């Protein structure tokens, strides 16, 4: 039976104790915002959230930066039907980003807890578009087979870190720590030890 990202799924993993809670999410958002602003040397203006689910990044993000423009995409018909209009969410699968360019490159591109569920062919189809859409920082929270992460293991693809690193670097991303990657547009701005 195919995995369903319905209300029951989001209740289980994000509301009923699930994985991390609001405080952890707020810290994650603050880290991504601060990193983007540090590297851009200006306030954050635009955010694209790929695989956004119910758009949970939106509230803590707008609490920090009320003027930021947030746009989310997800493949959950439930999440888009329920929250699409109120939270500026649209329907798309990861592979759709091979051609989908909903806006100019953004300051912060978020793809949190998504890539380790995306089949390799679809991942390889969508990643170049993700690189094009990122003008600042990409927060690519991804887990590997060696991580002791807890959470939804249904459909988890236990790849090694090199699998992701090779793909991200081939597209021009440079790792700067804590799931943050400099976009190809900013990669040359980092000092050697920022990317070591």
Predicted regions and their residues:
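Class I (Rossmann-like) S-adenosyl-L-methionine-dependent methyltransferase catalytic domain
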Residues: 1-104, 118-196
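A conserved beta-strand element that flanks and buttresses the S-adenosyl-L-methionine
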Residues: 110
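Short catalytic micro-motifs in class I SAM-dependent methyltransferases
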Residues: 113-117
């Amino acid at each position: 039976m195919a995995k369903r990202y319905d209300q029951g799924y989001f209740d289980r993993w994000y509301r009923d104790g699930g994985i991390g809670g609001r405080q952890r999410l707020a810290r994650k958002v603050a880290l991504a915002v601060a990193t983007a602003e540090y590297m851009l040397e200006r306030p954050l203006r635009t955010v694209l959230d790929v695989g956004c689910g119910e758009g949970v990044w939106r509230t803590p993000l707008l609490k920090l930066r009320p003027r930021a423009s947030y746009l989310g995409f997800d493949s959950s018909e439930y999440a888009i039907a329920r929250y699409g209009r109120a939270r500026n969410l649209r329907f798309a699968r990861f592979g759709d980003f091979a051609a989908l360019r909903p806006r100019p490159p953004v300051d912060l591109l978020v793809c949190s807890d998504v890539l380790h569920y995306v089949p390799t062919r679809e991942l390889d189809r969508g990643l170049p578009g993700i690189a094009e859409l990122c003008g600042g920082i990409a927060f690519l929270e991804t887990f590997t087979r060696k991580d002791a992460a807890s959470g939804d293991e249904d459909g988890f693809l236990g790849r090694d870190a090199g699998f992701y690193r090779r793909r991200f670097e081939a597209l021009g991303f440079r790792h700067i720590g804590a799931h943050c990657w400099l976009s190809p547009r900013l990669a040359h701005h980092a000092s050697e030890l920022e990317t070591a």
